[in-house]
UniProtKB/Swiss-Prot annotation:
Synthesizes alpha-1,4-glucan chains using ADP-glucose. ADP-alpha-D-glucose binds at K15. Its EC number is 2.4.1.21. It is an enzyme of class 2 (transferase). This is Glycogen synthase. It comes from Thiobacillus denitrificans (strain ATCC 25259 / T1).
Amino acid sequence: MKVLFVASEAFPLVKTGGLGDVLHGLPQALHGLGVGVRLLLPGYRTLLRQLDQVRIVAWFDVRGAEGPVAARVLETRHPGFDFPLWIVDCPPLFDRPGNPYVDVTGYDWPDNAERFAVFARVAALLAQDAHEAGWLPDVVHTHDWQTGLVPAFLADLPARPRTVFTIHNLAYGGHFPHGDFLRLQLPAHWWSHEGVEFHGGFSMLKAGIVYADAVTTVSPTYAEEICTPAFGYGLDGLLRSRRHKLHGILNGIDSATWDPADDPHLRARYTAGRILPGKRRDKQALLERFLPAADEAALQAPLVGLVGRLVEQKGIDWVLAAMPLLLAETDARFVLLGSGQAAYEQRLTRLARQHPTRVFVEIGYDEALAHQIEAGADMFLMPSRFEPCGLNQMYSLRYGTLPIVFKTGGLADTIVDTNEASLADGSANGFVFDTPDVAHFVDAVRRALALYRQPSLWRRVQQTGMRLSFDWRESAGHYLALYAADSAGEPDV
């Protein structure tokens, strides 16, 4: 089987979030299972600068907003991938500063509709082997709104590969005005309520849902949630009507990169069979980074970690509301790494100044520190209001750092609340609250702090989490089964 992945980012070449991690881990795992893989990416300036040797495999003139747009397709190899990469090199659309979707001031590029429509047109041509390279995919797997037009361009062709569209976050719909639809000269028959039209404009994400042969999202619970008005962003009715072709497949993690037994970022390594000595040394190293005079009392106190975007979706407002209370009534320390809305950054920084021996804050992102927090913290906060899949809770389980999460999306699929029943059957691996407010979040943290004072039970729950597997190979197996069933024309995979 041959699969063409089409996406707007992939780690380590370009990454703005979890999408980039998936577009590294999943294709790599499928390649390891014997699938022929190609990955198509836009030729961003920062991406092209990382490539050493490239060869031109195709030239296309495709329709843009103001007429034909010339695009080269480059083939290259990169140490991060075990298969060839294809890059759409179109300097007027992609050779620019800023990140893939926004300019240096943080605003969306005004021509995003054209950028990703052109990218999708090129992808559709490659999927038909229009460049006559002799590599014709059986499946084209597209990801998020930036690639939603690819299944639409392919849908009406008589002989074509099957298409799969993955929703990583329904909150980002790729919405554009009707004027862009007209300027791009998109097919007129798409413009309907049953097509891409959405509240007077059009949605590239909706195009993927409507025209793909199969639609997936990144956890079973999120697949259920997005079919409801609370999580559907106006597309829940469409998703309910497509429920027979909507599949929730849990993301995996890079088990080699996130491995406490072999992590180069740590002072000490450890395993599920021998947690305490190594994790204690990593906790000490983490404390010493922020508190050089850390004493035994600090080492014995619970250390609570957080790594993530400082935005409301991630529940950072609940964390900020809870911390003064927890600082007053417990001896817990907090270490937080992230960036986001300026108001939240400022409040955290102010809290750290007020409690310099108990609250440690790093604004920004530091890969090594992220690993060190996962290893050195005792528990990990992830109270997201919604979380399509989430990765950090799986990293935390692997590092014996018990997650405290809200019951939503992939968090609900991976974390089992610690209570009398789950302790008895051995499934407990973290702490879950299911009412979205500060009081219930605080209650979950208190329960975690109470269990921390029972070392034998705490160790048992740590070991349960560390022995779980979230390797990408398991997720890849589910996708491979979907590809095979969908290619065979089975509608209810």
